[in-house]
Design a protein with these regions (language model features):
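Non-catalytic nucleic-acid-binding/docking modules located in mid-to-C-terminal regions
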Residues: 15, 19-29, 44-50, 79-82, ...
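Noncatalytic, basic helical substrate-engagement surface that gates or grips nucleic-acid strands
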Residues: 1-108, 114, 119-131, 205-222
């Protein structure tokens, strides 16, 4: 049984709990069905085009482990705020939660689409180990985070296969929204392609229209026996070592 993804995910939870001194986690997952693809059929159509058979097999193995995390592993451990919504992405759920429900939230992601939320949360990038705030964003880009959807709509998003305006990348888009792009071909091209902006903005701006606000449950409790059961079932012996398990117990205030 492949368990590498599960182990890595749980280890990340432990490390985040230590770094931010919390046992409060909210997990948001992508739906397999995509309303964005209904709006724009080319959305993410590039994701599987050039993958080898081996890569497809690896993806399927990882998908099964992520499914097992969502049901049954995380609930068994005691986590209750685990959300998925048909047709919507984790980004949509995160966005509506931090805008309407969660205060002082730290969003853990390496997806720069979520930078638009920095006016109401902080973002921790697990790859760079960097905590991004509204202030650090404004210092780097010279605009408020609320402008990010407009910038991305102009530039497009290669990873999501959203085509922007030809010749306009993030740098040119930033110059344009600051009102500093000089007259010329690029500026004319932007004004002549308003239809692209009209198409892209609803795809990029978060949350997607129609996202329903999840209900946060506050009554989470974590029990030693449940953690032992999960760690033994998946043979996570390093988590069961005395020092490591004592850390788990302390971090999650287990009973």
């Amino acid at each position: 049984m492949e368990t590498g993804v599960i182990f890595g995910f749980l280890e990340t939870i432990k490390n985040l709990s230590k770094r931010f001194d919390t046992n409060k986690f909210v997990f948001c997952w992508d739906s397999k069905k995509s309303k964005r693809r209904e709006i724009y059929p080319e959305y993410k159509a590039n994701r599987n085009v050039d993958k080898t058979e081996t890569e497809h097999i690896e993806d399927n193995i990882a998908f099964k482990q992520f499914h097992d995390l969502r049901v049954p592993i995380l609930p068994k451990l005691g986590f209750k705020n685990i959300f998925i919504q048909t047709g919507y992405e984790s980004d949509d759920l995160i966005a509506i939660l931090v805008r309407k429900r969660l205060k002082d939230a730290i969003v853990v992601t390496n997806d720069d689409d979520l930078l638009q939320l920095l006016d109401c949360c902080e973002i921790y990038n697990p790859r760079t180990k960097q905590l991004i705030t509204c202030e650090t964003f404004e210092s780097k880009y010279g605009v408020h985070p609320s402008m990010w959807p407009h910038i991305k709509s102009l530039a497009g998003c290669t990873s999501d296969n959203i085509k922007g305006i030809e010749g306009v990348g993030i740098v040119k888009a930033l110059i344009f929204v600051k009102g500093k792009l000089p007259s010329g071909k690029i500026r004319d091209r932007i004004f002549n392609n308003c239809a692209i902006l009209k198409r892209n903005t609803p795809l990029i701006k978060l949350p997607l229209e129609g996202t329903v606000l999840p209900i946060i449950q506050e009554d989470e409790k974590f029990y030693i026996d449940n953690f032992i059961d999960v760690f033994e079932k998946y043979n996570f012996r390093s988590f069961l070592k005395k020092e490591s398990f004592e850390q788990w117990c302390k971090l999650f205030r287990m009973e």
